[in-house]
Amino acid sequence: MTVSFENKDFNQFINSSKFLVEYDVMSALKQEGLKQSDYVEICRRLNRGPNRNELGMFGVMWSEHCCYRNSRPLLKNLPTTGSRILVGPGENAGVVDIGFGQRLVFKIESHNHPSAVEPFQGAATGVGGILRDIFTMGARPIALLNALRFGPLDDEKNISLLEGVVAGISHYGNCVGVPTIGGEVGFDSSYSGNPLVNVMGLGLMETEEIVCSGASGIDFPVLYVGNTTGRDGMGGASFASSELSKTSIDDRPAVQVGDPFLEKGLIEACLEAFKTGYVIAAQDMGAAGLTCSCSEMASKGEVGIELNLDLVPAREKGMTAYEFLLSESQERMLFVVKPGSEEELRELFIRWGLYVEVVGKVLKEKVVRVIHKGEVVANLPASALADDTPIEEHLLINSTPEYLQEHWKWTEDLLPKTLDNGIINIKNNLFISWNNVLLDLLSMPSIASKNWIYKQYDYQVQSNTVVSPGEADAAVIRIRSQNDFLTKPKKDRGIASVVDCNDRWVYLDPLRGSMSAVAEAARNLSSVGAEPIAITNNLNFSSPDKPVGFWQLSMSCEGITKACLALSTPVTGGNVSLYNDTKLQNNTVLPIHPTPVIGMVGLIEDINKICKKSWVKAEDQIWMIGLPLENNINQDERISLSASSFLEYIHGLKTGRPPEIDLNLEKQVHAFLREVIKQGIVNSAHDLGDGGLAVAIAECCISSGYGANIILPPSQSRLDRLLFAEGGARVLVSCSTDQSEELKKYYKNISLQGSNLFSISHLGNVNNQKKLLVSQSNNTIIDVNILDLKDTYKDAIHKKITK
């Protein structure tokens, strides 16, 4: 449904006797983030003017954050079905079947705007919110990941944001006892005023009784459980649905305050309560608080809910109905339970130190009815709040935006000619050796080790973490059964998970960049030996009200759809965060890079056969799976210096069109990689990402302490292209001499069965000399000590912060 209204008639409309209200409509609409056309539509549905409480409820529920009014038409095209999918989009989290009576529950959410205002609490409550999404489904939380974006660390403000966000994530996750096992962090000037904080949660359940959120049972009691309700987080959903400005940066009351120790009790109490069989439906109170939980539970169950605010545990005296309804105080849940179970459940929750009250009941009439001080203060159709919400009409431009047309004109021919020992740097017209190019790339915070961040997280709590952060291309945790009655698998199984997005690529081509995000996530999972099974996505974009912004979002959704269909990784749900723009003091608006973060999960049948990225022993041979290094002048468009880290960080150019994404190639490479890992043919695996071949080899050397001898084939291609180009579905593996014969044999066998789109290329061998040596035609190209590589890579972020 699309709503529209002519401004010139609005004053006449609101002053008509039928829709007259006792408040200033214009100022109220501004406060709630609603349009005049929204107000007209609300009046049409109610056949009266809404009171002030009701308008506030519509304000949060019709915000982009809650109803996806700009993105819903695009999201419906995402693939959401598959053989393992048990619960897809629409519930608190997605659920997939991983066999042996076990289900994996997972989702990703953003807390971007709150983290810009108050980084510690904004990030901490982001963790708390995603954990509630997980255990509300009946699953025990087992892991967390995060995807973060900040402005350059040359700015003290960005350093402060980074420190605050990492501290908030660390504090909440560590205190609640859920390991933060991985993630990704990027830095770009577009995020200087608008950092991104995306948190992904995973949970394990071993019962068929998935707890859903749709209410049922006329007159069944509605139970409030958890923390008290205060004035923190007021209007958080509306705040998250508008661009950041100096005014909103100072809007600290819109940021919630979390209590991880109370959340820990809430987790245990809820999981215990679910086992009783008394809980009919459950919904956490996140964005829009009581308003959202009541309206969504009622709408999904096609019933109504009566809520008595006089019974809600209050943190502060004198709270109004409006404040109760819009508060986003943390660690709160709403249950529908079986009649007669109230006292038993009350004792259970009190034992865990939680507030618990019967605050309402399920109604036959499909409304959300709110009572305060003995009077009805709101009475609204549940579907109007949570289901039948407005959809914005946007005209999709039918041609590539001008900014991209200009970027796509760039070609590698515009770079200075390469020499055997280096290149002229366009940024300052000075010569730079290949050694220093590599060291400079490794010192860039987006590429460098994130050890300064990881070491603040407790990633070993629960004792199921198999791979420490940074050791492999994906995080891996052991699946440890919680129930003795389940049939046990013969081998120790695991779950691999990853979050991925090359935002520079998406900025320079939203379609290819988004396809690449899905493909890289699947490649990273395959690099540890995991079979990718499903994704959750977090679409972080700028304003869709601008034609370019909506085009970027549309192209990104199309790219995700294509890649998910090709790689058989359906979407189980996720989050959309729009209006990630910063209004500068001169009134110009700075949009972020479009950043569709892909959270992907995969299944490992035997965790004893996973691969890390470290070389394992000296003299192992180094191979590359995927597209080969070129040996002629004809360039493969699937590999390029365009949009590369080399181009941006060495030459200061963020331009060019990212490489073509060959999804059939990706699929073949992933399958081959998983099989050779399963058969024990390779000892290590690491995909080529930011910085291309040279950076990938350096990372393998740094993590292992071993060196490498790499011999580039004779080629007419540019040296920088061979060393630093990106793309091509390429993965480095290492194996012994005997294993190398097995690798070649297996590749030959599958070649006989069909057409291979990829090759395996021998590049060199692991050495014990503690040096990375790269040569071509007997000319030394790179000769760097591993300790120098390690010091540069490991200390880069710490040095930036403490400079």
UniProtKB/Swiss-Prot annotation:
Disulfide bonds: none
UniProt-annotated binding residues for substrate: S110, H111, N112, H113, R132, Q256, E328, S329, Q330, S577
GO biological process: 'de novo' IMP biosynthetic process
Function summary: Part of the phosphoribosylformylglycinamidine synthase complex involved in the purines biosynthetic pathway. Catalyzes the ATP-dependent conversion of formylglycinamide ribonucleotide (FGAR) and glutamine to yield formylglycinamidine ribonucleotide (FGAM) and glutamate. The FGAM synthase complex is composed of three subunits. PurQ produces an ammonia molecule by converting glutamine to glutamate. PurL transfers the ammonia molecule to FGAR to form FGAM in an ATP-dependent manner.
EC number assigned by the record: 6.3.5.3
Pathways involved: Purine metabolism; IMP biosynthesis via de novo pathway; 5-amino-1-(5-phospho-D-ribosyl)imidazole from N(2)-formyl-N(1)-(5-phospho-D-ribosyl)glycinamide: step 1/2
Protein name per its UniProtKB record: Phosphoribosylformylglycinamidine synthase subunit PurL
Subunit structure comment from the entry: Monomer. Part of the FGAM synthase complex composed of 1 PurL, 1 PurQ and 2 PurS subunits.
Cited Pfam families: AIRS, AIRS_C, FGAR-AT_linker
Chain positions recorded as Mg(2+) 2 binding sites: D133, D284
Binding-site residues for Mg(2+) 1, renumbered to this chain: E109, N575
CDD domains found in the cross-reference section: PurL_repeat1, PurL_repeat2
Chain residues that bind ATP: Y68, K107, N537, G574
UniProt keywords, alphabetically: ATP-binding, Cytoplasm, Ligase, Magnesium, Metal-binding, Nucleotide-binding, Purine biosynthesis
Family label: Belongs to the FGAMS family.
Catalytic activity: N(2)-formyl-N(1)-(5-phospho-beta-D-ribosyl)glycinamide + L-glutamine + ATP + H2O = 2-formamido-N(1)-(5-O-phospho-beta-D-ribosyl)acetamidine + L-glutamate + ADP + phosphate + H(+)
Active site: H65, H111 (proton acceptor)
GO molecular function, one term: ATP binding
GO cellular component, one term: cytoplasm
Subcellular location: Cytoplasm
Gene3D superfamilies per record: PurM-like C-terminal domain (3.90.650.10), PurM-like, N-terminal domain (3.30.1330.10)
